[in-house]
Amino acid sequence: EYEPKYLTADEYLSGNVREKLSQAEQFSKDSFEYRVNAEYLEKVQPKDLTPGEISVKLGTTWIPEKYIEEFVFELLSPNYYAQSKIEVKYSNLTGEWNIQGKSADKGVKATNTYGTSRISAYKIIEDSLNLRDVRIFDYIYDENGNKVAKLNIKETTIAQQKQASIKQAFEDWIWKAPVRRDDLCKIYNVRFNSIRPREYDGSHITFNGINPEIALRKHQKDAVARIMYGGNSLLGHVVGAGKTWTMVAAAMESRRLGLCNKSLFVVPNHLTEQWASEFLQLYPAANILVATKKDFEMKNRKKFCGRIATGDYDAVIIGHSQFEKIPMSAERQKTILQNQLDEIINGIIEAKTENAERYTVKQMEKTKRGLEAKIKKLNDQERKDDVVTFEEIGVDRVFVDEAHYYKNLFLYTKMRNVGGIAQTEAQKSSDLFMKTQYLDELTGGKGVIFATGTPVSNSMVELYTMQRYLQYKSLQERGLQHFDSWASTFGETVSAMELAPEGSGYRMKTRFAKFFNLPELIAMFKEVADIQTADM
């Protein structure tokens, strides 16, 4: 049974307004009073984008399989027999494209015009769909009799030229047929061009108990309003914008109004005392608990966590490394790991059925072994009754200062050797990710606040990492939970030969060279991000 509730106009008429309109239209069929909702929502719908405003590349995962198949058949003109064998499939589970029956077509277009004697056009298209640059290897035996792959630069260069011409042919073809054009525009607009930004105004907030000598600036009050009324937030504020006081005021005001029960501030280890003094400078009567190094020594940890759990504190301040020492319960960790393992096992079965790349299956087998080892380690650990878990300390909002220290979050990608992608797991990042998922569940996506002066410093991959921490559900709703889906929608990689760091020859390095569909990416990111630069 749907339980109606009142919302302010600025909240209701922002966010995913296309989805809200479709719900309002549905409800207004049964109940006339929802007609007014639909009328207001109609006025704030984003303007539909046209083909000229949408960038599409070969490999973009929101394009239906049937159109990729259509393109393949039009480009390579396989005979009727070959067509009956060839099928293009995309797996939501693994994020992998697969062309079945690649070897059925021996025509000149597949082997010569768009392919080479070493690689067929179908394999080149499959690699392109999976965002991989084509590479041709020769297999030789070293002095110990081991088989070694050696990159054939000449054949690779020829194959990559064919790959470039196929990609260009796809871009020339995709928007040509009117029916296909209309369908693709509709899919893109519904999925990505559906957000109306919400403006937050904190001018009405009274800040009871604040130091009367201190006046918060407008951008600070507005950011407090965002944290209180919006959901998970990222304060991307430059040094000097006062993000410490913004977070403190948001925590105190949220607690006063019953919007959260207990706030935990996770700050760089050497700044805990400075944070405490700034906290008390803004709210002199606040009741806060600050962790010292001693509190997290083995013999004192349980007692300190017990104080967090039972004390009626306005806020608790701990260091980054101390936060990691308050674990999620073993049961919850096992559940999360088991879910990931089930997904990977299904992915491997699917990949083998579809005859996917050996490389993909090997990567997934490696991930599977890693997850099994983690589960075994959890099972082998003695059940320590004296450990207080994160779920038990009663925290329902976490403020993470200098959140860029957590940007090294593992991601799986089919792309090879791409700059800026963490292929190793930083324990503190996976621990934080697990806790943000728990808080999302507990608070409906309102319990995580990040602050950093550098949300994106080296690579756009960091933007995706921030989105995973703060708006994972939004990524899932848009089919972007795989990094490769996100990358194929908003970015393009370029591969080039460069000198290997140890000077022992050349290697192929892939980098994100350009980004497109940026207005839609930024609109999505700004649902959580509050950015303040020096000139604002």
Stretch-by-stretch model annotation:
Residues R301-I348, T353, R358-K362, K366-R397, ...:
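Inter-lobe coupling linker of SF2 helicases/translocases
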Residues A241, M252-E253, L280-Y283, R332-I336, ...:
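Glycine-rich, phosphate-binding/catalytic loops in enzymes
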Residues L184-I187, R198-T206, V238, A500-E502, ...:
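Short coil/turn segments at secondary-structure boundaries
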Residues D401-E402:
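Walker B catalytic acidic pair
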Residues V238-A241, T246-S277, Y283-N287, L442-G447:
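Conserved SF1/SF2 helicase motif Ia
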Residues S194-G236:
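Conserved pre-motif I regulatory segment
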Residues H270-E297, K303, R307-T310, L470-S474:
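Conserved helix-turn-beta segment of the N-terminal RecA-like "Helicase ATP-binding" lobe
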Residues E1-S194, P284, I308, D312-V316, ...:
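Charged, low-complexity intrinsically disordered regions
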